[in-house]
Design a protein with these regions (language model features):
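Structural detector for internal amphipathic alpha-helices that build alpha-solenoid repeat scaffolds
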Residues: 3, 11-30, 41-44, 51-65, ...
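N-terminal small/polar loop signature for handling phosphorylated ligands or for N-terminal nucleophile
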Residues: 7
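Charged/polar interaction segments and conserved charged motifs
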Residues: 10, 50, 165-169
């Protein structure tokens, strides 16, 4: 059912997710274990639908939270933004624990690593605030790749909405 989610539209994805949830719930209620090796293998295949992989991760986390936590360590550069966000959050949580123990030497590299892997704007801003609190300000403009300086090398005539269509000699 998880593989069937590859290439499915949103409507079909919702139906397939409900089917997977029903099957998993029935198996767990009957006392049967979920096939963790197959779920982990599916989760590692990044070519599958990100929502299907997220569902596989949730099933692993439901039955074996320790394994799910171990899997997150390898997902800092995952193409699935939801899984990547969880992996980054794990690093941020570790950094928060280090800060609580007044150990900024450990926290700063964790936050730097989290910042390099983060893609969620609110998460990036939160990490930047924590780094600023540790005396390591982050240039968010540079981090996001915004152009802040440029040079105009010639005129640009846009009278009458000519724009780019005009050819200059």
């Amino acid at each position: 059912l998880l593989v069937a989610m590859d290439g499915a539209n949103d409507y079909a994805l919702n139906w397939l997710r409900a089917a997977v949830d029903a099957v998993a719930g029935r198996e767990l209620t009957a006392g049967h274990p979920l096939p963790l090796p197959e779920l982990k293998q599916f989760l590692r295949m990044t070519e599958h639908n990100p929502r299907a992989r997220r569902l596989a991760f949730e099933l692993v986390a439901r039955t074996d939270p320790a394994t799910a936590d171990q899997l997150l360590a390898g997902m800092l550069n995952d193409p699935s933004l939801e899984l990547r966000r969880d992996a980054v959050q794990k690093l941020v949580d570790q950094a928060d624990q280090a800060i609580a123990r007044t150990n900024p030497v450990v926290a700063a590299p964790l936050l730097q690593s989290a910042l390099r892997s983060a893609r969620d704007v609110t998460q990036i801003e939160g990490i930047a605030d924590k780094l600023k609190g540790l005396g390591q300000p982050v240039d968010l403009q540079k981090h996001f790749g915004f152009l802040s300086e440029w040079k105009v090398i010639g005129p640009f005539d846009n009278t009458g909405k000519k724009g780019f269509a005009i050819a200059y000699p």
